[in-house]
């Protein structure tokens, strides 16, 4: 998946999620496209630096559905904003959404996905095995009322163990060196009951 990134306290989880996706092996062709227009060494598949997350965040705020942009307002963006920005830049040719959990599982076993879901306080603290839980119904409803959300990558599904693996952008100090496991039934609750979004970017040829 490339180096673990750090969103550095910005509300730019969207930008760093798309950075993580672009640094994944399956998106090497898309990464090459970014490098072709942003680095002196064109047509390389070298990993993108951490500060690219901030650049994508800025672009996303200009393409999303919200009435602000960063800078000056660091109020976040959306998965749609990130996808539209990278499509406009020619980094991805297309993207689609999946609104069915079975489709999420199917895609999640084929390529990394961008997830935007409710994020409760307890999800920030993986247990000793790197597993996160979404908390109680009361905690979920409180997070929903407070508008607490987060964008992150789904990088795999272990169907026998009923676990999804996610990549965050809070340094290697978080979870399993920047990643965590989430029970699939709890992920389904976030996506289906609390209207999470699941973006599937089109992979470019490497």
Regions found by a protein language model. Give the residues of each.
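Catalytic-core signature of thiol
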Residues: 1-206
